[in-house]
Amino acid sequence: MNNLSTIQKKLLSIKPFLVTKYHVSELGLFGSVVRDDFSPMSDIDIMVDFSRPVGIEFIDLADELERQLDRKVDLVSRKGIKPKYFDAIQPEIIYV
């Protein structure tokens, strides 16, 4: 996956599966993938929220996303982001 549009389309196509298997309620792209500095070496920054508490499923979800997107994924939980960091990334988040 090498551009925002392609990544968005892929995430939209697999979102029903992610909702069912991993209890995903929200996915948001941020970081270099939504800015002009995304490169072949960049990872994909994804913020996720869940409809119920998860444990090891978080790691399984990260692995699944890396497999589906064929690129390293930096997955962060919405609830795990400190407010000052969320405030910094919020303007650039693109929800899928």
Identify the role of each PLM range:
Residues 1-26, 34-36, 40, 51-96:
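Catalytic core of pol beta-like nucleotidyltransferases
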Residues 29:
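Conserved histidines in hydrophobic membrane contexts and catalytic metal-binding motifs
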Residues 45-47:
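Short beta-strand->loop micro-motif that forms the acidic, two-metal-ion catalytic signature
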